[in-house]
């Protein structure tokens, strides 16, 4: 089978190319230029060319910067301006890696597309990876069934800790790729997301900090530098116990802070993004952010079309803009973008 592989220049995607060949597939490499860091692109492409030459793989480089800016970068920047906490990786996947890249793969005559994601496919759905510590199923919740049917994840049944030693034993020359930095959570952010926002907004505008009763208790450095649940970077006069960001008011450049218990929520509201056809009601588990544990929940659509998840236990740090992802055991059912949350008795 002819399979397109999204290549990054690192060991994971390079070893994936070898595994696909070992499984009998004809591999075609694809590299996407998404951001404006040309130095990083040059290093990645140099690595990819080396891998392609060694394995005899045809590779194609596509410049998708304009599309990426429209669908992902602008969304990222706009979200922070609105006081939200965006999830650019989950937002990128349906549009870029499994949208634009899949279209290019089909044009090249490929039947399927593979990536180095730590995830699996089962029964037409995204399944969690064997390596729970590296599982990336959360970021893939937005993929349509028609896309999932074309996916291959060569690393999904492997442990991350075993891949590098195994790869270097079989393909010792992969050691020359060691200068490749392990991919960050956000590909276009070098060190701190604030550096990106600083190009567009005056992010250091100080503002007031209030407690949940409206009393002014301190000062912060600029609302875009905070997310729900953050407990550092602002002052609270006379405080002896930790204070956490409860909400962000972008119009007034104001933070509302309180105790950890005030941060607790058990109802989450989300804008549906990817749901099974005919979805009305679901009982299973949900995740409110990438590194959170799954929580049992009952989820339904309300009269206005919002997803409403009633959680069986309290969660902390629910941030508007993040993804609410639904799981039936280890299978991703769908999800949406968090709009709000509350605590109900």
UniProtKB/Swiss-Prot annotation:
PANTHER family: MITOCHONDRIAL TRNA-SPECIFIC 2-THIOURIDYLASE 1, TRNA 5-METHYLAMINOMETHYL-2-THIOURIDYLATE -METHYLTRANSFERASE. Its main location: cytoplasm. GO terms for biological process: tRNA wobble position uridine thiolation. Disulfide bonds join 92-187. GO terms for cellular component: cytoplasm. Pfam families: tRNA_Me_trans (PF03054), tRNA_Me_trans_C (PF20258), tRNA_Me_trans_M (PF20259). This is tRNA-specific 2-thiouridylase MnmA. The keyword GTP-binding does not apply. ATP binds at residues 6-13, 32, 116. Belongs to the MnmA/TRMU family. It comes from the Bacteria. Residues 134-136, 289-290 are annotated as: Interaction with tRNA. It is an enzyme of class 2 (transferase).
